[in-house]
UniProtKB/Swiss-Prot annotation:
Cofactor list: Mg(2+)
CDD domains in the record: YihA_EngB
UniProt superkingdom: Bacteria
PANTHER family: ENGB-TYPE G DOMAIN-CONTAINING PROTEIN, MSS1/TRME-RELATED GTP-BINDING PROTEIN
Binding positions for Mg(2+) per the UniProt entry: S46, T68
Residues where GTP binds: 39-46, 66-70, 84-87, 151-154, 184-186
Name of protein: Probable GTP-binding protein EngB
NCBIfam families tied to this protein: GTPase_YsxC
Gene Ontology MF terms in the entry: GTP binding; metal ion binding
Keyword Cell cycle among record annotations: yes
A GO CC annotation given for this chain: cytosol
Length: 219
């Protein structure tokens, strides 16, 4: 199948769900392609989603870390979705809620067959915290490719930025081709073309081509 270019500006809100069980109820089965966005509560996840889709208010941003507690799903087209997972690791969130989030995130990564890739967003000034590593390990263990996106790269000088990028790449080298590392700035647009290229590739997995071919054969 020739890869078509996906217009991420067409993303529109589809549903919110409190956990993976409810997600299964709302979505039309575990089919098509989903790309998940995960990160600590202060990683700039909502800002990144808004920048990549060129929509100021697609994902709600908040000055209060930990506000996004739901799984929010955005539709690109009939077969493709972006999934904004709850922010994790915020210190002032009650422990019981933290554990519930972590369980929900783990279940989603391990059980969702249509998951084509995971973007793990990290503030470039504070990368690779324990929960970030856990998310990456969960995804790779499930054979899901990961983009480790180092956000807020405009906060560092070029030399410091590239030093951190290289350090993170070295720290994740054990995962081989399963993990890519890129700097990103929602404010400046740094890294946006590269990120969109990776997401576009993830939007065209072989299983989707097989699904569409089977649908055509059935008709």
């Amino acid at each position: 199948m020739t890869e078509s270019h996906i217009d991420f500006r067409r993303a529109k809100f589809l549903i919110s769900a409190p956990d993976i069980a409810h997600l299964d109820q709302y979505l039309p089965g575990d089919v098509g392609v989903e790309i998940a966005f995960a990160g600590r509560s202060n990683a700039g996840k909502s800002s990144a989603l808004n920048a990549l889709t060129e929509q100021k208010n697609l994902a709600r941003t908040s000055k209060t870390p930990g506000r996004t507690q739901l799984i929010n799903v955005f539709e690109l087209d009939a077969q493709r979705r972006l999934v904004d997972l709850p922010g994790y690791g915020f210190a002032q969130v009650p422990l019981a809620m933290k554990l519930k989030w972590q369980q929900s995130l783990g279940e989603y990564l391990q059980k969702r067959a249509c998951l084509s890739g995971v973007v793990v967003l990290m503030d470039i000034r504070h990368p690779l915290k324990d929960l970030d590593m856990q998310m990456i390990e969960w995804a790779v263990a499930s054979e899901i490719p990961v983009l480790a996106l180092l956000t807020k790269s405009d906060k560092l000088a070029q030399s410091a930025k590239m030093k951190t990028v290289n350090e993170v790449r070295k720290a994740l080298v054990e995962f081989g081709d399963w993990v890519q590392v890129e700097p990103f700035s929602a404010l400046k647009g740094t890294g946006k073309p590269k990120v969109l290229s990776i997401l576009n590739e993830w939007c065209h997995p072989q299983w989707l081509a097989d699904e569409l071919e089977n649908q055509e054969d059935a008709e």
